[in-house]
């Protein structure tokens, strides 16, 4: 009987933790100005497709540096884009 309560309690705790992580992912994404983001991360933060982000980079709308085959974007550049 006690083990049933322990299992149910741990399942509830796991569910609540998962819900908190999900809420944080949806509503708590904060762009850190000094952090460096990949184009994939930037697309998630901006709520657009990665190809759209690449287009904005290539047009000069978002400043980024190419490292190897990938672009790296400073968080402050994402904030600047969002404040336009």
UniProtKB/Swiss-Prot annotation:
| A Pfam family reported for this protein in Swiss-Prot or TrEMBL | HTH_17
Name the UniProt key words of this record, in alphabetical order: Biomineralization, Magnetosome
Tell me the InterPro entries matching this sequence.
HTH_17
Any GO CC annotation of this UniProt entry: magnetosome
Q: What turns on this gene? A: Locus amb0973 is part of the probable 18 gene mamAB operon.
S-S pairs: none
Location in or out of the cell: Magnetosome
Null phenotype?
When both copies of this protein are deleted cells have a weak magnetic response and make magnetosome membranes; the magnetosomes are less numerous and smaller. Deletion of just amb0973 leads to an intermediate magnetic response and still makes magnetosome membranes. Deletion of genes mamH to mamV (amb0961 to amb0978) gives cells with no magnetosomes and no magnetic response.
Q: What does this protein do?
A: May play a role in controlling magnetite number and size but not in control of magnetite morphology.
Q: Which family does it belong to?
A: Belongs to the magnetosome MamR family.
Other notes on this protein? This bacteria makes up to 20 cubo-octahedral magnetosomes of about 45 nm in diameter which contain membrane-bound crystals of magnetite (Fe(3)O(4)).
Q: What is this protein called?
A: Magnetosome protein MamR
Annotated source species: Paramagnetospirillum magneticum (strain ATCC 700264 / AMB-1) (Magnetospirillum magneticum)
């Amino acid at each position: 009987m006690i083990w049933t309560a322990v299992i149910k309690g741990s399942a509830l705790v796991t569910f609540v933790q998962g819900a908190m992580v999900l809420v944080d992912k949806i509503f708590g994404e904060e762009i850190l100005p000094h952090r460096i983001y990949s184009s994939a991360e930037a697309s998630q933060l901006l709520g657009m497709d990665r190809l759209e982000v690449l287009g904005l980079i290539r047009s000069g709308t978002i400043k980024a540096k190419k490292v190897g085959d990938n672009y790296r974007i400073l968080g402050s550049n994402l904030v600047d884009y969002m404040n336009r």
